[in-house]
Amino acid sequence: MDPRELAERLTERDLRILIHLAESGEATPEELAESLDVDLGPVMRSLYWLEERGLIESEEETHEVYELGDEGKEYAEEGLPELRIVEVLRKIGGEGRLEEVLDRAGVPRKLAGPVLGWLRRKGLAEIKREDGETSLVLLEEEPEDVDQSVLEALAAEGSASVEELARKLEMDEEEVEKALKRLSERGDVLRAREETVKKVRLTERGEEVAEHAPEVLERDWITELKPEHLREGTWKEKEFKPYDVKAPTSPTFPGKRHPLKEVINEIRRIFLEMGFVEVSGPLVESSFWNFDALFQPQDHAAREMQDTFYLKEPAEAELPDEEVVEKVRAVHEDGGDTGSRGWGYEWDEGVARKTVLRTHTTAVSVRKLYEVEGPPLKAFSIGRVYRRETVDYKHLPEFHQCEGIVLAKDVSFRDLLGILEEFYRRMGFEEVRFRPAYFPYTVLSVEPEVYFEEKGDWVELGGAGIFRPEVLQPLGFDPDVVCLAWGLGVERLAMLKLGIDDIRDLYMSDLKTLLELPTARARR
């Protein structure tokens, strides 16, 4: 596209920016916004678009910016202590007793030494000692103090660089730097920080387009079709400005659910579509349902205080009917009627009564199995679970799990693998594989893994298996009844779907991050 045609496609703001840069050579976005009398946001969008088209180039420069500290604000308003002393001396005839002058100038005794030093250093006054008396003698009645000028300039501007101060005060930069150095030696007078400034300038291509900018701005053409143009027919006599459909616009942030909530809703939708019913259970659970009913021994490491949250109040929970409790006791001690040898220890009902914050949603599944009369049953649950984890990029003490079960007489291990493969396929993962695993309450047991293309690796996403007879038979199910079961970490799945490497980012309240995160379905 030739320079003239490109100029015709630019907005009025773009053209004015090019003209300004052609005249000034370079400018900051803030300077352009002030010159064009528009907000900084639209200027930044224009600069981004112009740079994308190769019409301008940008460069970032880092320099020190100064602002006043608490003492500096006081001195800017009331004057530096040495200048206040000069004013007092001038009013009393050029000489006075030291204590009297300090008092009238409002200079604390603790600052007397440093202030006298500045008086001598700047040649404003000298100390005279005579007959045991110490006096101050004025040497300069109307000093032009650069330090005070810098303080007042910073008070007016808020903050400024050496270059900006020199320009405002019409001084050499070297003179301003010396003043800043002196002021920096005086406690909390100045505060310095680094600031990065972006400057833009025209490229060779931009200079060619800028030559046509004034002419294009002066053209009398229609930039926006209005009702009066149609009503009066004036559109027939005028030229329409070319419309660039690729021109940048303000970003739109419509309302949306929290990204983690999106993932949870997608999981729920998929299981409902697959014919499952959703069930739920209490967050505060008895150790019986959380551990014992799942054939997890009472001395298992997962039940220790460093892994599980035990409650002080209520400290104990009620157990189900005695028949179920006794059957669970039997499978733990000697296997009961299951053919298993159990764990070979004396089961303690008191330990089973202890209350915990549930450590997994499998407790919801086993409660549901206790409540139903028999197969068939296809159920899932999604809920919060709690573990004593050290918080890091992949662990939280509170997180979500999804649990599912299929209770039937005519299902097998292959059905379990098929259900999981279909679920992950609907979640957007085409490649799924299973690795052998061990869990106390399932046999056979596997860990599903999905291939994550962006990382080029396989990622484990949960655990699955067939509930052992030691879990099902105490609940009243016949030996020919099979229960497929699985559980997965929702946050880990969400991290993959959303492209997040740190699990803590899912719970950040930073609005910018939440606005920019894609929805879960956007990455399918």
Swiss-Prot record:
In Gene Ontology terms, what is one molecular function of this protein? magnesium ion binding
The protein's name is Phenylalanine--tRNA ligase alpha subunit
Enzymatic class:
ligase
The similarity annotation says: Belongs to the class-II aminoacyl-tRNA synthetase family. Phe-tRNA synthetase alpha subunit type 2 subfamily.
Q: Where does this one sit in the cell?
A: Cytoplasm
> What is the gene called?
pheS
Q: Which InterPro entries match?
A: aa-tRNA-synth_II (IPR006195), aa-tRNA-synth_II/BPL/LPL (IPR045864), ArsR-like_HTH (IPR011991), Phe-tRNA-synth_IIc_asu (IPR004529), Phe_tRNA_ligase_alpha_bac/arc (IPR022917), Phenylalanyl-tRNA_Synthase (IPR002319), WH-like_DNA-bd_sf (IPR036388), WH_DNA-bd_sf (IPR036390)
Where is L-phenylalanine annotated to bind? T362, Y441, F467
Q: Which GO terms describe its cellular component?
A: cytoplasm
Q: Which reaction does it catalyse?
A: tRNA(Phe) + L-phenylalanine + ATP = L-phenylalanyl-tRNA(Phe) + AMP + diphosphate + H(+)
How is the cofactor bound here? Binds 2 magnesium ions per tetramer.
Tell me, which GO biological process terms does this entry list?
phenylalanyl-tRNA aminoacylation
Give the signal peptide as a residue range, or say none if absent: none
Top-level division of the source organism's lineage: Archaea
**Organism of derivation:** Methanopyrus kandleri (strain AV19 / DSM 6324 / JCM 9639 / NBRC 100938)
Q: How does it assemble?
A: Tetramer of two alpha and two beta subunits.
Its main subcellular localisation, reduced to a broad class, is cytoplasm
